[in-house]
Each structure stands twice: as C-alpha cells, then as structure tokens.
C-alpha cells in the first residue's frame, strides 16, 4: 500500500511545480513519473524500506537509500515505456528488445538524486532525474539505414537553429518528422548526425516561442517556421519548407526546438 501511494505522489508532487516552470517546460506525466521534454530529463520517485536485520541505524539508512534509488530507476524505465519514439514505434516496443533494455539500464547510472525524504519509520523516498541526452535517446531510437544528406543550395545560413511553431494538436516524441506538401521528409531522425544524436537526441520541446528562442539548442540567432499537425507528422508549407531546406547545418546538428500548441 505504501509503495502505491508513493508512486501516485511521485506524479502528483510535480503538479505543484513553480508557475514559471509549468508555463515554459513541456512536461509529459505518466503513471510512474514524468518526462521534461524541455530539459530532456526523465523524473521518477522510488521508495526504500530499511532492512530488519541491519547492524545499526546508519547501515539501515544506507540500505534504505539504495533500495529507494533502485526503485526510482526501475520506475524511470517504466516512464520510458510511455514515451513516443516516432510515428510507429513507442518506448515499450523498443525496451522489449533485450539488447536495448540492457543498454538503457546501463545508462541509468547517470541518474542523479534530486531529493530524498527520510521518514520516521526509517523508510526513504527518493526522486531521481535521468538525462535523455548523452546517449539514452540514441539507444531508444530505432535502427536507421545510412543516408547521405542532400547538398544544401545557396550560401551557408547565418542562423544557429530552427524554432518550429506547431499549429494543431501534437504530442512530443523522440524523433518527430517534418514533411512538405508532397510527403517528402524535411527533418527527422535521418537528418541528424550520429554525434549530435548521441549528444542530445534530435529535438527539444517548449510551450512558448520565447522560451524556444532562449533554449541553448537554438543558439543566438534561430530562425522560426510554422508548421501544422498532420497526424503522425508535421506539415511544412512552401515557405517553411524552403527555410528548412536552407538550414542543413542546423538540422544536422539537431538544433531544432519545437513549440507545442497550447492545450
């Protein structure tokens, strides 16, 4: 019963986040925790009880902390199962592959404890945050056939990133696709270099254009485009498509921030 109540608290406590955070960050809440698509972190809370046979109070607390951390990391994997990867693949499907699951579990060593609560009965509640950046996102993305990027016409762009404003309902995913009117892909997993994918995935999300332009991923001089939601893809009109085709370097570096529509 205690663990069940605490798993609810792990999500409910996030609702009370500061107003500025809630207004700017795109957060997906799940049964076991949350995904901050702006910071690209997964947050979950775990609980640990002290062993009955501990030799002293200090040993009991250390073991309770270890158990709470292990429980929280297990919940991180459950959160990842609820993450959308691309149009046809979800986190649960990717993590059903043993190799992918073991690699993801190995990345959980990079999780950091954010808060710990020590209860009167010796139990510990611990909240951990695990970065999707630095490899975890790359592990979750499906295998991709090698593609040679198309040459970019015209002089190099002075823009440092692309801010994509979405019109219409759209949910975050690790590998969004932006297509033109003919269905040709303008941006997606194949557009981003492997080093950039390992560094920080393919995209970040925010809830306002101002925060997207201030995001480190956008750089100092991003260009903005508007697209519309088209089911599992984002549709760029002729003007937006032309801009995207001219931003080859920014796209290859994954310097894309998507502004989600207001709920």
Language-model features and meaning:
Residues 21-263:
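Domain-level marker for long, solvent-exposed, non-transmembrane regions
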Residues 1-9:
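Bacterial N-terminal signal peptides that target proteins for export
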Residues 9-10, 20:
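Cleavable N-terminal signal peptides
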């Amino acid at each position: 019963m205690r663990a069940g109540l605490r798993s609810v608290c792990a999500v409910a406590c996030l609702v009370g986040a500061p107003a500025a955070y809630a207004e700017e960050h795109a957060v997906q809440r799940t049964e076991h925790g949350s995904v901050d698509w702006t910071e690209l972190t997964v947050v979950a809370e775990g609980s640990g009880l002290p062993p009955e046979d501990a030799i002293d109070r200090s040993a009991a607390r250390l073991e309770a902390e270890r158990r709470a951390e292990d429980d929280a990391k297990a919940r991180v994997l459950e959160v990842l199962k609820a993450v959308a990867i691309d149009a046809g693949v979800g986190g649960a499907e990717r993590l059903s592959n043993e190799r992918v699951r073991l690699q993801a579990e190995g990345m959980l060593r990079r999780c950091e404890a954010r808060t710990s609560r020590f209860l009167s009965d010796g139990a510990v509640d611990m909240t951990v945050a695990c970065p999707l950046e630095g490899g975890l996102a790359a592990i979750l993305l499906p295998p991709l056939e090698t593609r040679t990027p198309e040459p970019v016409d015209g002089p190099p762009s002075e823009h440092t990133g692309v801010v994509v404003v979405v019109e219409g309902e759209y949910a975050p995913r690790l590998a969004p696709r932006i297509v033109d009117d003919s269905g040709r892909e303008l941006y997606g997993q194949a557009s981003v270099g492997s080093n950039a994918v390992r560094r920080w995935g393919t995209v970040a999300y925010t809830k306002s254009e101002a925060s997207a332009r201030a995001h480190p991923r956008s750089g100092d001089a991003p260009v903005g485009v508007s697209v519309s939601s088209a089911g599992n893809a984002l549709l760029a009109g002729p003007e937006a498509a032309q801009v995207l085709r001219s931003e080859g370097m920014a796209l290859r570096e994954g310097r894309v921030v998507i502004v989600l529509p207001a709920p």
